[in-house]
Amino acid sequence: MAKEIAKSLLDIEAVTLSPNDLYTWSSGIKSPIYCDNRVTLGYPLVRGAIRDGLINLIKEHFPEVEVISGTATAGIPHAAFIAEKLKLPMNYVRSSNKSHGKQNQIEGAKSEGKKVVVIEDLISTGGSSVTAVEALKLAGAEVLGVVAIFTYGLKKADDTFSNIQLPFYTLSDYSELIEVAENEGKISSEDIQTLVEWRDNLA
């Protein structure tokens, strides 16, 4: 599954690699990889495979789940697809409270006393996941864990989740993706070294 998802992300250019002309993330980090999983929404077969893959992760690791929660904004549609398929309540978590109305940070199904799984599109450092998890816990939820489409495999993410003692699982990761990219002829063996060094240095 990991390689199939990685291939799909590369094929539809949801993930692009540029070892010699780095992208700049919003955080200012210079990176040879850019991931925009919102692109998957335009490809029904890909988004369906992602939905089913994430459902399999949930059934395997969190079978007692009662509420599906998406992180705003990119996690929301995938959470909706999953909740619909599983016939479960759903909500989503903003990065901060609204500045108007009821000033809610969580919209949708009530979380209090419920076992919740958080849906992310991408895990880089794990920061946005922690924000969502903390908001849900504050609302009285029992957060079981996080599932996501893709992770860069950074040590910082492992440390972040370890610090809050919460498991996370992804459909594919950076190592799988660059291996698939090399096999597909999208990058050279020299590029592989550059990509691995970037990840290790950033970690």
Curated annotation (Swiss-Prot):
A single BP term in Gene Ontology: 'de novo' UMP biosynthetic process
Binding site for 5-phospho-alpha-D-ribose 1-diphosphate: 94, 98, 100, 120-128
GO MF term set: magnesium ion binding; orotate phosphoribosyltransferase activity
Keyword presence, Plastid: no
Keywords associated with the record: Glycosyltransferase, Magnesium, Pyrimidine biosynthesis, Transferase
Repressor in keyword set: no
Positions that bind orotate: 124
Alphabetized InterPro entries for the sequence: OPRT, Or_phspho_trans_dom, PRibTrfase_dom, PRTase-like
Names of the cofactor(s): Mg(2+)
Group of enzyme by EC: transferase
Documented EC number(s): 2.4.2.10
Pathway: Pyrimidine metabolism; UMP biosynthesis via de novo pathway; UMP from orotate: step 1/2
Reactions performed catalytically: orotidine 5'-phosphate + diphosphate = orotate + 5-phospho-alpha-D-ribose 1-diphosphate
Function: Catalyzes the transfer of a ribosyl phosphate group from 5-phosphoribose 1-diphosphate to orotate, leading to the formation of orotidine monophosphate (OMP).
NCBIfam families in alphabetical order: pyrE (TIGR00336)
PANTHER family named in the record: OROTATE PHOSPHORIBOSYLTRANSFERASE, URIDINE 5'-MONOPHOSPHATE SYNTHASE
Family per record: Belongs to the purine/pyrimidine phosphoribosyltransferase family. PyrE subfamily.
Subunit and partners: Homodimer.
Protein name stated in the entry: Orotate phosphoribosyltransferase
